């Protein structure tokens, strides 16, 4: 598949090969990661990458766009069908740019926005001080109830009434419970705010009908196209309002982007077609079953799951019961070829670079074909490693590392990813 890269640039070929090996023979539990199909990968590697196409289908600033127009129309139409909306912009290069485009469509610098605090499960683009959203806007963060660890809707309403935001953002990157979009819309309407839902993490679950569709309540919905959607890395913006759609289009181009990535848009179209199948719906159901099983098995073995469980593809694990930090856990598990990410938890006492938790997700494991019984095996592996972490640097006895690596490789070999499908 990469013969030309191998001939032209052996160093990059080696990087690709090593990364393929890492994915093929390691357990991927980062909640925001997944494995794209070969059809999606092929579309991304096509000659469509050569075409500049500033503007939108039928209104381009360059000639020769007749075929990329077809690709973009297919992507838009499939996105609209998938999420039951009237309008879709599939040009954002990323979820962050989708959020930026959505914000800029309905607000001005200095306006007040509300978003979930990063330490409570939100995202950088929901108002973090280090992000454009925290630098451009006056940000009022909301969080979870300290006892239940679920969104405190009373607090959201009180803050909205007090600060009168222009935008209320719902969604997050480490929140495992179903969000009440109806309640959010009621609060937004009460204060005259736009409700923007960032469904990047759970878009695949929405597409499969096992998570409420935010488009029924939000003025604007943003998303990535990877994660649970299992497509290429990119973003999109959805709405049912024609005037908002016009503003969104202007906001993306010429507002914050120039030429769209047509090879990625074609891959988005492929991804949406895959997501419209019954097989995809079954896949998403299994993702949630696996997440619930993994959370229960970890809890059974002494770890604490934030909010007591999960309704989605991800969970936030509090490591305090084992007196291990998120940083140490990420390093230790990584040595054993189990990939996770450290994550702050509600009421965090450590810095984000150390953290008290890890975030786990099941989309990538489920793509391999793993089910509940494998989640039990994986929970056992995770806890066994964590119980043997010796220090803040994630050091673990070599005997434990070698034993776990072997078990991980055996498990991955039982559920091959691209092995036999890609010619190396």
UniProtKB/Swiss-Prot annotation:
Pathway: One-carbon metabolism; tetrahydrofolate interconversion; Amino-acid biosynthesis; glycine biosynthesis; glycine from L-serine: step 1/1. (6S)-5,6,7,8-tetrahydrofolate binds at residues 118, 122-124, 243, 351-353. GO terms for molecular function: glycine hydroxymethyltransferase activity; pyridoxal phosphate binding. It comes from the Bacteria. It is an enzyme of class 2 (transferase). SUPFAM superfamilies: PLP-dependent transferases. GO terms for cellular component: cytosol. Its EC number is 2.1.2.1. PROSITE patterns: SHMT. Its main location: cytoplasm. CDD domains: SHMT. Its cofactor is pyridoxal 5'-phosphate. It catalyses: (6R)-5,10-methylene-5,6,7,8-tetrahydrofolate + glycine + H2O = (6S)-5,6,7,8-tetrahydrofolate + L-serine. It holds the Pfam family SHMT. GO terms for biological process: glycine biosynthetic process from serine; tetrahydrofolate interconversion. It is found in: Cytoplasm. The modification N6-(pyridoxal phosphate)lysine is found at residue 227. The record marks 226 as: Plays an important role in substrate specificity. Keywords: Amino-acid biosynthesis, Cytoplasm, One-carbon metabolism, Pyridoxal phosphate, Transferase. Catalyzes the reversible interconversion of serine and glycine with tetrahydrofolate (THF) serving as the one-carbon carrier. This reaction serves as the major source of one-carbon groups required for the biosynthesis of purines, thymidylate, methionine, and other important biomolecules. Also exhibits THF-independent aldolase activity toward beta-hydroxyamino acids, producing glycine and aldehydes, via a retro-aldol mechanism. Homodimer. Belongs to the SHMT family. This is Serine hydroxymethyltransferase. It comes from Thermosipho africanus (strain TCF52B).
């Amino acid at each position: 598949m990469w013969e030309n890269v191998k001939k032209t640039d052996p160093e990059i070929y080696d990087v690709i090969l090593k990364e393929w090996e890492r994915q093929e023979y390691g357990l991927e539990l980062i909640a925001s990661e997944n494995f794209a199909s070969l059809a999606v990968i092929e579309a991304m590697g096509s000659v469509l990458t050569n075409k500049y196409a500033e503007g939108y289908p039928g209104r381009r600033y360059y000639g020769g766009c007749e075929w990329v127009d077809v690709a973009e129309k297919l992507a838009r139409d499939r996105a609209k069908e998938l999420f039951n909306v009237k309008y879709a912009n599939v040009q954002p290069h990323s979820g962050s740019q989708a959020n930026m485009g959505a914000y800029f469509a309905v607000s001005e610098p200095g306006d007040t926005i509300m978003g979930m605090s990063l330490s409570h499960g939100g995202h950088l683009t929901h108002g973090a001080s280090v992000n454009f959203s925290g630098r451009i806007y006056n940000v009022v963060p909301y969080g979870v109830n300290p006892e239940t660890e679920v969104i405190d809707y009373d607090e959201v309403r009180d803050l909205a009434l007090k600060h009168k935001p222009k935008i209320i953002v719902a969604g997050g990157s480490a929140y495992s419970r179903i969000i009440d979009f109806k309640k959010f819309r009621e609060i937004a309407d009460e204060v005259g705010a736009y409700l923007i839902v960032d469904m990047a993490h759970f878009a695949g679950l929405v597409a499969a009908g096992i998570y409420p569709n935010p488009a029924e309540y939000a003025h604007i919905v943003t998303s990535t196209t990877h994660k649970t959607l299992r497509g290429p890395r990119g973003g999109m913006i959805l709405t049912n309002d024609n005037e908002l759609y016009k503003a969104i289009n202007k906001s993306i181009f010429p507002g914050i982007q120039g030429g769209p990535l047509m090879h990625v848009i074609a891959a988005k179209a492929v991804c949406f077609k895959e997501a419209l199948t019954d097989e995809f719906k079954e896949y998403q159901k299994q993702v949630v079953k696996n997440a619930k099983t993994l959370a229960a098995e970890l809890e059974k073995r002494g770890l604490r799951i934030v909010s007591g469980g999960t309704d989605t593809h991800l969970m936030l694990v509090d490591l305090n019961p084992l007196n291990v930090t998120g940083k140490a856990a990420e390093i230790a598990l990584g040595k054993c070829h189990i990939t996770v990410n450290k994550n702050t938890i509600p009421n965090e006492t450590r810095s984000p670079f150390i953290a008290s938790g890890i975030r786990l997700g099941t989309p990538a494991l489920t793509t391999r074909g793993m089910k509940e019984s494998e989640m039990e095996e994986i929970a056992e592996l995770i806890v066994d490693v964590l119980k043997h972490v010796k220090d803040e640097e994630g050091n673990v006895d070599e005997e434990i590392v070698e034993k776990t690596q072997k078990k991980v490789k055996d498990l991955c070999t039982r559920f091959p990813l691209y092995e036999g499908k890609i010619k190396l």
